[in-house]
A protein has these predicted regions:
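Regular secondary-structure segments
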Residues: 18, 22, 96-100, 112-123, ...
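Short linear motifs at protein or domain termini
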Residues: 1-93, 97, 101
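Short, Lys/Arg-enriched, disordered terminal segments
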Residues: 1-12, 196, 208, 212-216
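A ubiquitous short alpha-helical element
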Residues: 78-82, 99-103, 120-126, 166-175, ...
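Short helix-capping and inter-helix turn/linker motifs at the boundaries of alpha-helical repeat units
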Residues: 8, 175-178
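Contiguous, function-dense segments enriched for cysteine-driven chemistry
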Residues: 40, 56, 78, 135, ...
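Conserved amphipathic alpha-helical segments that form helical-bundle/coiled-coil interaction surfaces
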Residues: 105-169, 180-184, 198-211
Length: 216
């Protein structure tokens, strides 16, 4: 029989302070005062100090020379999310343009095999499965640019949505990613016959889907 591991005081502080940031109780620019948090959480200052350091490492908090630890403007709302998806869409279309102009051979088999893997996962109800596959699709396409800068931005985009997206953004991303997966076969077929204009239009459709899902 497995025993449940006891949560440390630092992890309790981390979880509770993070919750306050994500629900807006602690807003961007607010100072994190150890004494105040200690009283609110009924925990000594030492684990609170450690938790603040952990939150800083995760991007929720930054240190100011004059004000100490303050809440960063890290939470991704709907408007910021749409801006990020537009940028990602531009990168993906740039990859298609490069495949077209440089006459690069598209690895159809790799994407087809991945699509088969996705189909085998359809019984899973958790929408994050599809979000992870959408990330794979974007990363795979961006490899044709042969530029780690684009890959890093794409990687950060998907990771930041998971970590910093507000509740509305997470739902939009998950629902829109299902539409992306539904269109992968269309993308493969278009690439196979060198119909690059259709591929570009499909990317536009995928980006637009994020907006349409939000206002459904």
């Amino acid at each position: 029989m497995t025993t449940k591991r006891k949560e440390t005081r630092e992890s309790v502080c981390y979880r509770e302070i993070k919750k306050k940031i994500r629900n807006g109780e602690l807003k961007p620019g607010d100072r994190l005062i150890e004494n105040t948090l200690s009283q609110q959480l009924e925990i000594s200052r030492t684990p609170i100090r450690k938790a603040i350091g952990m939150l800083a490492a995760d991007g929720y908090i930054e240190y100011n020379d004059f004000r100490g630890a303050i809440v960063k403007d890290s939470i991704i709302n709907k408007e910021r999310y749409f801006e990020m998806t537009e940028i990602l869409g531009l990168f993906l279309k740039q990859a298609i343009h490069k495949i077209r102009t440089k006459k690069i051979t598209f690895n159809k088999l790799e994407m087809t095999n991945k699509l088969a893997e996705i189909k085998n996962q359809e019984h899973q109800e958790h929408p994050l499965v599809y979000f992870d596959y959408e990330k794979w699709f974007a990363q795979n396409l961006l490899t044709y640019l042969k530029n780690n800068y684009y890959l890093k931005i794409s990687e950060d985009f998907f990771n930041n949505i998971k970590e910093f997206g507000d509740e509305e953004v997470i739902k939009i991303a998950q629902n829109a990613s299902v539409k992306t997966i539904d269109n992968i076969q269309n993308f493969i077929d278009a690439m196979d016959v060198h119909d690059y204009d259709k591929c570009l239009n499909l990317i536009d459709d995928l980006i637009d889907a994020h907006v349409l899902v939000a206002y459904r």
